[in-house]
């Protein structure tokens, strides 16, 4: 893995880059590494810039605020179907899981707060199930329709049920 940092006190227009599975992923940060990590996840058709007004706000409140462009969005690589296949929640949640392991964990062992908007909400919830012991809270608003479609899935119900106490409803 590679990690290229331009500035710690982030200017959203001068982002950081991280190489994930051979793809360049763009991300921003505000705040100090040792503070409570928050990852902001954008919705479909958006980018990390969706959260530009939130990063500094939370950084001033003792948080290390991160926002990243999910692969296929914003300034991250836009791989074709031949390179990666279909982009989906599984790929994006693995991207966030690896971001936590490779970018945040070397500097910070605190539990992470995930905040998602629409598609980002689904990614946050899926990542939280995968990293149950590393996630403090999930804030998801609004949830995409895919959550409604998966209501009949017994495995999904059990996975999300055991994480329910960490889920903040808005």
Give the residues covered by each predicted segment.
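Active-site loop/oxyanion-hole signature of alpha/beta-hydrolase fold enzymes
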Residues: 8, 14-28, 60, 64-115
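Proline/glycine-enriched tight loop/beta-turn segments at coil->beta junctions
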Residues: 31-37
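Active-site glycine-rich loops that stabilize anionic/oxyanionic intermediates
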Residues: 35, 43-46, 118
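Alpha/beta-hydrolase active-site loop signature
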Residues: 45, 70-74, 145
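Serine-hydrolase catalytic-loop signature spanning alpha/beta hydrolases and amidase-signature enzymes
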Residues: 45-53, 65
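Conserved hydrolase catalytic core segment
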Residues: 106-150
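Helix-rich cap/lid subdomain of alpha/beta-hydrolase
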Residues: 138-170
């Amino acid at each position: 893995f590679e990690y290229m940092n331009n500035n710690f006190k982030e200017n959203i227009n001068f982002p950081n880059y991280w190489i994930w599975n051979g793809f360049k992923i763009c991300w921003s940060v505000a705040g100090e590494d040792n503070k409570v990590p928050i990852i902001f996840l954008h919705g479909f058709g958006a980018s990390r810039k969706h959260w530009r007004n939130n990063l500094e706000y939370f950084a001033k409140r003792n948080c290390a605020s991160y926002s990243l462009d999910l692969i296929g969005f914003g300034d991250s690589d836009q791989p074709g179907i031949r390179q990666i296949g279909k982009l989906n929640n599984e790929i994006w949640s693995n991207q966030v899981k690896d971001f936590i392991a490779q970018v945040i964990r070397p500097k910070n062992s605190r539990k992470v707060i995930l905040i998602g908007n629409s598609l980002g909400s689904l990614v946050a919830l899926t990542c939280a199930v995968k990293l149950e012991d590393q996630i403090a809270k999930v804030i998801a608003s609004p949830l995409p329709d895919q959550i409604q479609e998966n209501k009949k899935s017994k495995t999904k119900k059990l996975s999300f049920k055991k994480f329910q106490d960490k889920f903040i409803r808005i």
